[in-house]
Amino acid sequence: MNFNKFYNKFHDEPIDCENFPDIGQIKSTSVGSGGSDNIVLIVVQDNIKYAVKIIPTLFYPKYKEQPNDDQMEIKFYQFFTKRYILTDRTPHIVGIYKCKTCDNIRDFLLKIKPKKSCPTFEEKLLKKVQYTQFENQLCNLLLYGENKLMDSKFIMALLEYCDFDFSRYLRDLLQNVYQNNFGNNIGEFFYELTRILFQIIFTLAIIQDDYPGFQHSDLFIRNILISITDKYTDNEYVAYYYKQKIFYLPANGIYAKINDFGTSIIVNELESNTYIYDKQTNKIFHKNPFNHKNDIYNLLIDIYFAFDEYIIENKLDESKINPIINFMDKFIDIETINKIFEINYYQLKDTWYIDGISVLENTIKTPHDYIMSDVFEVFQDLPANAKIIRHFNSPRL
């Protein structure tokens, strides 16, 4: 909710590639999700947290033309920030403050690397080497550089800070519900999950309305980030407008944000340089950017598998499983998914794209159809004493 204010503060400040960020300002580190080569630094400056995403440029010898997915990801951040976040269309996308192409990635990596030597492969096999995932990533990148498989230039992007990703938050919510008074907490759990799903589905709907050829292509729970705010009063609300409907959410609470656009596309607007080749195989892999069910299917099936994993790990009995089934059935045809799950678990889990696969397409709706249905009616009543403090996607914008 404070993105616009922070954008005005950071956007015009130049980035000093040699001295930024100050090592003392780095509070935590992580690596990109889903096998990404990116690294992420959480920095605190003037009591404001933000994420610094470091995007190396790797060389792929088998390609005549090097894929530009990482450069396209930055363009998506910039596009969505300008088109949707700063204009109050939606706050549910991770915004970018600024970015810069810097030189000499080796010096940068050595500056932020812990004072440890990188282990050899033999040492990894024969010794109990205590290295974090972040440290391993740095060592791998340095190795790429030594073997001339990484350019000296890299992208440094300053992004909006979020507290954690949806996969972790979902697990924390489940722990709280099932280990601390199930009966009293299950309703609140489903309310919070409904809020998150509304925010993401609303955002997908307005983007797809504007750009029918948009597809995120990697919309799993690890790529949804979560921020939580409690600075507003209980009677302060935010309003969301879609077609003839208005939805009201308490200003306090969860704000889910779509992140990671490395495989995203808007046909004829933002396309990677490999899309011309991808089109030749899209039919084989059931991939179609104009299929508006694909992204929401990925998100819902990932939640389904997260629930399944938790149920198995904690050996939940039927009385505690049924509420989950009833909730998920509002969004996805659980009977059909369960049937496929029992017949071919691995095929279901490995199916990312569903264009032309009618048995999967029929289990869900498009984002537009979810919004126009009654599944989010809990957010359509505004309390009598409520005060609306922000309007998103208002027809007056």
Curated annotation (Swiss-Prot):
SUPFAM superfamilies hit by this protein: Protein kinase-like (PK-like) (SSF56112)
- The keyword Transferase is assigned to this record: yes
- Gene Ontology CC entries for this record: virion component
Gene3D superfamilies noted in UniProt: Transferase(Phosphotransferase) domain 1 (1.10.510.10)
Stretches assigned to the Protein kinase domain: 25-397
Binding-site residues, ATP: 31-39, 53
Quote one Gene Ontology molecular function term: protein serine/threonine kinase activity
User: Which chain regions cross the lipid bilayer?
Assistant: none
Keywords in alphabetical order, please: ATP-binding, Kinase, Nucleotide-binding, Serine/threonine-protein kinase, Transferase, Virion
Return the InterPro entries for the record.
Kinase-like_dom_sf, Prot_kinase_dom
What is the first-listed, main subcellular location in coarse terms?
virion
> What does the record give as EC number?
2.7.11.1
UniProt subcellular location: Virion
Q: Which reaction(s) does its UniProt entry say it catalyses?
A: L-seryl-[protein] + ATP = O-phospho-L-seryl-[protein] + ADP + H(+); L-threonyl-[protein] + ATP = O-phospho-L-threonyl-[protein] + ADP + H(+)
Catalytic residues at 218 (proton acceptor)
The family assignment reads: Belongs to the protein kinase superfamily. Ser/Thr protein kinase family.
- Name this protein carries in UniProt: Putative serine/threonine-protein kinase R301
